[in-house]
Amino acid sequence: MLQLWKVVRPARQLELHRLILLLIGFSLVSMGFLAYYVSTSPKAKEPLPLPLGDCSSSGAAGPGPARPPVPPRPQRPPETTRTEPVVLVFVESAYSQLGQEIVAILESSRFRYSTELAPGRGDMPTLTDHTHGRYVLVIYENLLKYVNLDAWSRELLDRYCVEYGVGIIGFFRAREHSLLSAQLKGFPLFLHSNLGLRDYQVNPSAPLLHLTRPSRLEPGPLPGDDWTIFQSNHSTYEPVLIASHRPAELSMPGPVLRRARLPTVVQDLGLHDGIQRVLFGHGLSFWLHKLVFVDAVAYLTGKRLCLDLDRYILVDIDDIFVGKEGTRMKVADVEALLTTQNKLRTLVPNFTFNLGFSGKFYHTGTEEEDAGDDMLLKHRREFWWFPHMWSHMQPHLFHNRSVLADQMRLNKQFALEHGIPTDLGYAVAPHHSGVYPIHSQLYEAWKSVWGIQVTSTEEYPHLRPARYRRGFIHNGIMVLPRQTCGLFTHTIFYNEYPGGSRELDRSIRGGELFLTVLLNPISVFMTHLSNYGNDRLGLYTFESLVRFLQCWTRLRLQTLPPVPLAQKYFELFPQERSPLWQNPCDDKRHKDIWSKEKTCDRLPKFLIVGPQKTGTTAIHFFLSLHPAVTSSFPSPSTFEEIQFFNGPNYHKGIDWYMDFFPVPSNASTDFLFEKSATYFDSEVVPRRGAALLPRAKIITVLINPADRAYSWYQHQRAHGDPIALNYTFYQVISASSQAPLLLRSLQNRCLVPGYYSTHLQRWLTYYPSGQLLIMDGQELRVNPAASMEIIQKFLGITPFLNYTRTLRFDEDKGFWCQGLEGGKTRCLGRSKGRRYPDMDMESRLFLTDFFRNHNLELSKLLSRLGQPAPLWLREELQHSSVG
């Protein structure tokens, strides 16, 4: 029996162990199923957030008896014909927060400005050009820097402001060591600092109010404890924003703290010293100060720098039918969408949600979500619709236009089968792929399949900062800047909003979203399907935003369909019609949505920019002899030169441009370049060139501008120009402003490229001097080997080519050519090195006098750049001084 127990006991222990392991395994599997269920099941909805209510519900009337409105005092406008519409901003440093906030608002409003470090003794910048004022408004980041100017600078600035009707905006930021109470030096105005305030209100009597709507009292504390309020008995000061002290301040001494009305912003009407000012007792971190600041700029500039009251908003809902289960819209969500749209139409005329669809994903949600899809289609006539891609694929991944067009046709067929109206002429690419950087196949397919006239993107010229986003037109399609609103595919629950729900509310109530509408006349907002299911944050956001805007501003909100909206945009900003192409490889986001079949290695490393008739073709020829240097392919339409940056070719895009260059075998050692001699004197080329090729080297060749003018005239005669054939050179260069148009056109092409200093200054505005090589064309003609040595060193080309052995002077041609075996040479075409009669003395004397000042400015410029003046320039200046 004992032996049997010894055998059975281990067996029973083994079964017990197995049972325990089985229970543990079952528990783990159960927990796994539970975790999967919890993660994939829809979350239990908390009560949906309610949008902002009517203005009338936001607090009671302000403290004290209401003041009757005061008739606005007459405003002295700036001398509009005598001042430039430019704001002069004095900042504490290039990195000060308030200074950056001031500049950001000016940039967002598209106002021109100039920043200067707040001057020390005698450092006031030049304020006038002869009798013309340079600035229409002066802003001081630190008011005390203005108040404490030395007597000479203060008198200079104040006299300028009085004479030209220029106003001043100043900010007073209290510090820890600031006096709690003090009189502002030289003004009948007292400051009380380092206060905690609450319950703010706009004074309806303030004359500067334009965008700002006078409000009822808004209860609640103002951020921070470093506020400054203003007190004065002088009639020149009118409160703009008013607050009251916090209860904790009641026990503090001083009669001002027991007053109910404490101005944080005051308007100086100019009755004290003839200068109008607006003074802020805090920075711009408080949202209402930003709003009043915009009004102050408008008022003090006589509305020369003023934002119109009209605002156009379009709300796109991307990814209709797209989205994983549990995040899509259901029937109740669609009903809420319709209800909110109708409510918004009472506040924003013609407001309509704009729905972008990808038909492939129709009915791919849960049963409830599929019913939501059907509900959207049932009410399809209530919305506007635009196409995404059929399968939500990014267009830049399609390298074949026909395949891309086939995807679009699938989406179009889906729309036809379900009765979706698609006649808006608008489309949006998933992830904005192919819109910018340009994917030409997308634009062509859009036009052929859908007849698209308008699209939008957040990527031009870059995503951040948003205030720099702009529109452009390419291939007949208008591209509008698209704005984000803080809602993305993953932001679907109010209490899980990144940074907390207060972050979303802060954006709506005076933050980024509010400022987007305030500072942009046209806003196209990107939202997503998932923002209208779940907690319906899209509905909450835009209803709250519209109501808040109507509470605090006088903006006239309205909606237009995409095509008239785009037409309106380019009426307002015609200068944006032409794009500014940039290097896609300089922006990671751009590179991610750019075809992998394209490479920035095909962009040139240097440009030969001219001017014409100075020897640039010879340099092009000599450089092409170098094994590490490769020129662009010749253009069949523009005299072999590409002429991309200065003409209609620019609008064909960078794909067209790069097709003129081979893919280098070694991008680090191979040098691609192009020569277009018309670039030098073009007003647009330096900016365009620097945008696309910011690191490119620039080579220019200068000869005596009189000789260049004569050479161009002879060039035109050789090509049969009837004006050059029928007029002498002297008649051309001395023609009056009343001369025939074609004669004056030839005159300009002879003379204007010779304004060397003017054109070089333009290039130096966009390129650092270290990237610009100014060659002596006369030296190039006499000693090309030495000139080519300079160029090779400038470019950093290896291996170094000895042009003394490579080039040979051709006696018959009268020019330097490539030396070949057997004493032969290979030279430029017969049109180069052409001989013609010497210039007549009358023309020579005329041009010497005509170019005297231009040559003098060139000499000064070369001296500043540390470059020696060429021999021809020294000779010209000597002759001019002798004459």
From Swiss-Prot:
Pathway listed: Glycan metabolism; heparan sulfate biosynthesis; Glycan metabolism; heparin biosynthesis
Region annotation (Disordered) ranges: 49-82
InterPro entries: Heparan_SO4_deacetylase_dom (IPR021930), HSNSD_N (IPR056793), NST/OST (IPR037359), P-loop_NTPase (IPR027417), Sulfotransferase_dom (IPR000863)
The keyword Secreted is assigned to this record: no
Membrane topology note: Single-pass type II membrane protein
Keywords from the UniProt entry: Disulfide bond, Glycoprotein, Golgi apparatus, Hydrolase, Membrane, Multifunctional enzyme, Signal-anchor, Transferase, Transmembrane, Transmembrane helix
Topology feature Lumenal, residues: 40-883
Catalytic activity from the UniProt record: alpha-D-glucosaminyl-[heparan sulfate](n) + 3'-phosphoadenylyl sulfate = N-sulfo-alpha-D-glucosaminyl-[heparan sulfate](n) + adenosine 3',5'-bisphosphate + 2 H(+)
Protein name: Bifunctional heparan sulfate N-deacetylase/N-sulfotransferase 2
Organism: Mus musculus (Mouse)
